[in-house]
Amino acid sequence: ILPVIIAILLILVIAGGALGKVLLDKYSYSKEEADWNEFYQVSESDRSAIILQDEMVEEQALIRDDVCYFDLATVHKYMNEVFYADMTEKLLLYANPTEVIRTTFGETSYTTTEGTQDAGYVISFVEGDTVYVAADYVKLFTNYSYDCYDRHVQVYTEWGTRQVAQLKKDTAVRLRGGVKSPILTQAAKGDTLEILEQMETWSKVKTADSVIGYVENKRLGDITEETETPVTDYQEPEYTSLTSDSKICLGILSAV
């Protein structure tokens, strides 16, 4: 009888071990790290994804000599439509009601009615058929913000309120909701995360350095609302028009 009991115990131990391994594999947290180049869809070292508000757009930024540049089409689409490239004269122009501000491609200076100013960086340049403009130069005439990180550039053009929460415990920010999803970055206890979307057990969040991923709800403290501070550095000029109290005749008077 003893050998039979021993055999049964061995079977139970083996079965329990196998079951434990299955449960461990199913519920343990993955330590796999996500590929940032793949996540941000950047294949060249001088390119960075653009996060506009809370979404990654298809356009990308160019990082050259530690300066962030956007192509002119991106500037027109998301930031400011007034910039104009004169490809014949090799000029980047910006017009307001009182003056035309100009800079030559490849130069660090720009000219206004007050004279020539040096920006300290190449303001614009051309590669192929594409005109690139320095993000800081765009900011001289546009109310928006940007911050450069390792593989991405965070851009804000609109402001309102946002939901935030502090982490109650160190945790991994994952590519998707789920313990097996690859890790994008690590967040520490006390870090403030922006809550983009809350689900049953996971929330889509944004870290202070604008990494968007997922954390478990049980790691989050109380959710509160914050009012964002808009950028108002640039005072847009007033576009005035002529008015008259009397009727204006646009025709030509004929002699009587």
Q: For each of these PLM feature ranges, what is it?
A:
Residues 2-199, 218-254:
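Primary recognition of N-terminal secretory signal peptides and signal-anchoring hydrophobic helices
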Residues 206-219:
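Short, compositionally biased
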Residues 200-204:
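Short aromatic-glycine-enriched beta-strand elements
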